[in-house]
């Protein structure tokens, strides 16, 4: 198994594990459709742009590095990178709240209305792209790509943890690190709270630059952003903020829901599709320099599948049609034409076909009576 898969699988287990605990204990009413969208929001497209980020970093390091750390103790290299990465993230995050083009990317993350671990993986397709300029300075200074990647995983793991809904205040750690209690304030709907506590791992950046907020209201003011409630379609949600920013104000409202999809059918489809995403990462990793026809086809079908799941979750018929095309197209191409016969691919693709046929037959799908068309 590729080392890249381990944190992704752990993330998936923790997201559903925490959601299960919150549901069973009654500490939070879980919107399972929202959990699926959070996992589905970035998906394979975000991975492509993460690969682009890694490629850019490697190119800058190989061509423009000053190699300042070549003769420095590894201890100082790692310590510097830990702090410099987090400093860069603080300003990345702060400017994503300040500049409209960057907010158009970051708003997808803040639209989540439930504070739990799944919110930690809710992102725009373009999140990795807008982060590139803030970290390339590390490549210029001479931080090797391998060190950058490990430090990135460490910091993103802390940020993921800081979205959990189970951890209480952490005593003296609250004075040094960003904790869930700090980050919860950042996700409150009121803008005065959202424009504070930008730090990723260390809270002292906020204290140093005047953006720290310790105040917790006696009653939580709710999470998310003002305005129309987002849909479950990642294509729409990742691009609509840019249309609004450009003044395309006649963006169509969400169409009426034609049916209600059960949480079970949506979760099953999301997990099966994510199984193929894991297979994609196992096969291709960060490699986007030697792209094959098969890699391109798999990427496009997985992206289409994530959009289709969003349509199904929103109760749209086109979502069912697109899902059927994707789930039948995958085995037709990869098994029928390209002869992929590995048991893993056969099993997951067979599961997707069964899922699509069950959905088409009406399993997990109930007509929305308010939108029932007359016969």
Positions of PLM-derived features:
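Membrane-embedded catalytic scaffold of the fatty acid hydroxylase/desaturase
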Residues: 40-55, 67, 71-228
């Amino acid at each position: 198994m590729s080392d890249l898969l381990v944190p992704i699988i752990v993330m998936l287990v923790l997201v559903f594990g925490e959601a299960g605990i919150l549901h069973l204990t009654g500490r939070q009413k879980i919107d399972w459709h929202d959990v699926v969208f959070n996992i589905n929001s970035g998906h394979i497209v975000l991975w492509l742009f993460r690969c682009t980020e890694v490629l850019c970093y490697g190119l800058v390091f190989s061509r423009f590095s000053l190699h300042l750390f070549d003769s420095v103790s590894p201890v100082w290299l790692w310590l510097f990178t830990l702090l410099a990465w987090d400093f860069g993230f603080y300003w990345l995050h702060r400017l994503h709240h300040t500049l409209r083009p960057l907010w158009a990317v970051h708003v997808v993350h803040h639209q989540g209305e439930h504070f739990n671990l799944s919110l930690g993986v809710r992102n725009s397709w373009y999140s990795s792209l807008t982060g590139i300029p803030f970290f390339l300075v590390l490549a210029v200074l001479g931080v090797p790509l391998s060190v950058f990647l490990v430090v990135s995983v460490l910091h993103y793991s802390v940020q993921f943890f800081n979205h959990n809904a189970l951890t209480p205040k952490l005593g003296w750690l609250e004075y040094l690190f960003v904790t869930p209690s700090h980050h919860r304030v950042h996700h409150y709907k009121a803008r005065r709270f959202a424009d504070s506590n930008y730090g990723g791992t260390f809270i002292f950046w906020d204290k140093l630059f005047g953006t720290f907020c310790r105040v917790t209201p006696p009653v939580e003011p709710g999470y998310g952003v003002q305005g129309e409630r987002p849909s479950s379609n990642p294509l729409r949600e990742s691009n609509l903020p840019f249309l609004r920013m450009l003044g395309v104000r006649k963006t169509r409202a969400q169409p009426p829901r034609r049916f209600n999809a059960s949480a079970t059918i949506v979760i099953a489809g999301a997990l099966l599709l994510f199984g193929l995403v894991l297979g994609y990462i196992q096969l291709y990793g960060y490699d986007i320099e030697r792209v094959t026809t098969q890699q391109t086809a798999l990427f496009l079908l997985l992206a289409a599948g994530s959009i289709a799941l969003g349509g199904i979750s929103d109760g749209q018929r086109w979502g069912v049609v697109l899902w059927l095309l994707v789930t039948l197209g995958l085995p037709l191409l990869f098994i029928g034409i390209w002869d992929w016969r590995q048991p893993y691919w056969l099993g997951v693709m067979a599961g997707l076909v069964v899922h699509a046929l069950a959905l088409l037959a009406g399993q997990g799908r109930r007509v929305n009576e308010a939108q029932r068309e007359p016969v």
